[in-house]
Amino acid sequence: MNNLFSSSWKRTGGGGGGDGDIESGGGVEMAPPPGAAAGASLDRFFEDVESIKDELRDLERIQRSLHDANEGGKSLHDAAAVRALRARMDADVAAAIKKAKVVKLRLESLDRANAANRSVPGCGPGSSTDRTRTSVVAGLRKKLRDSMESFSSLRARISSEYRETVARRYYTVTGEQPDEATLDNLAETGEGERFLQRAIAEQGRGEVLGVVAEIQERHGAVAELERSLLELHQVFNDMAVLVAAQGEQLDDIETHVGRARSFVDRGREQLVVARKHQKSTRKWTCIAIIILLVLILVVVLPIVLKFVNNNKSSSSSPAPATPSPPPPTA
C-alpha cells in the first residue's frame, strides 16, 4: 500500500511474432496519453479511501455495540452476567483498537503517497489533483477524530453511570445513600470495609456478598474498559495535531486564492509563450515557402528559357533549297 502510484504505464501491442509490423502491433510500445498516470493514481487512491471508510464504519458499529452493552448492563444484578458483559465489551474495545491502528497506518501511507505524487508532472503542490487528495485525506482524519470523540464521551458516560450504579446497589443493601468518601472507595477499589461490616450485620452475609461480588465485577469491567479506551484515545491523539494542521490549511481561503492566482498567472505566461511559438512557427513556415519558391524558380526558369530559345531558333532557320530538275535532252 505504500506504493500507491505507479511511475510507469506501458501498453504493448498483441501478436507474439515481433516482426515489427506496425499494423499488427507486434512488439510496439505506445506512450500513455498526458494525464493517464495521474488518472490511474487517482483510481488507486480512491480504492484505498473506500477501504479506510469501511474501517471507519466498523469503528462506528463497535461504538454503538459498546453503547448498547453499557445500557444493557444497567439492569444486571448477577456477577456472572456482569462478567460475561465485561468479556464482550473487552472484545469490542480490542477490535476497535486494532482497527484504529490499521486506519492510522493507512492514513500515514496515503500521506506518503500524496507527497510522492507531487513529483508527477501536473500534480505538484496546489494543483487540482493535489488539493483533491489532500482534502480527501483530511476528511478521513476528521471522521476519525469524530469517532475518537464518540469513544471519549462513551468512556466518560460509562464512568459516571458506574458510580450511579454503585450508589444504587449501596442504597439497596443499606437503605441509605452513600457519602462521597464511601462512593469513591467503592468506585475506585470495588471494596468497602464499612459497607461490608454494616450490611452483613443488618441483612446477612449471603445477600450482601452477592452484591459486593457484583460491585467488584463491575469495578473490574469499568477499570479494564477505561484502560482500553484510554489506549484507543491515545491512538487518536497521535493524529490530532495533523488533523488540526490540515483543517487550518483547508480552511485557509486566502492561501487557496493565492495558489489559484499563481496558477492563473502561470497559465497566462504559458499562453504568451505558446503564442510566441505559434508566431515564430508561422514566420519560419512562410520563410520556408518563399525559399522553396525561389529554389523552384532558380531550377525551373533556366529550363523553361532554354526550351523557349530552342523553339525560336528552330522556327527562324531557312528551309533547304530544292534542286531544279535537269533540262530535257533532245
UniProtKB/Swiss-Prot annotation:
Residues 212-274 form the t-SNARE coiled-coil homology domain. Residues 1-39, 311-330 are annotated as: Disordered. Residues 320-330 have a biased composition (Pro residues). GO terms for biological process: defense response; exocytosis; intracellular protein transport; vesicle docking; vesicle fusion. Keywords: Cell membrane, Membrane, Plant defense, Protein transport, Transmembrane, Transmembrane helix, Transport. It is found in: Cell membrane. The chain crosses the membrane at residues 285-305. GO terms for molecular function: SNAP receptor activity; SNARE binding. Gene3D superfamilies: 1.20.5.110, 1.20.58.70. Residues 12-28 have a biased composition (Gly residues). It comes from the Eukaryota. Vesicle trafficking protein that functions in the secretory pathway. Involved in plant defense by mediating host resistance to the rice blast fungus Magnaporthe oryzae. The interaction with SNAP32 may contribute to host resistance to the rice blast fungus. This is Syntaxin-121.
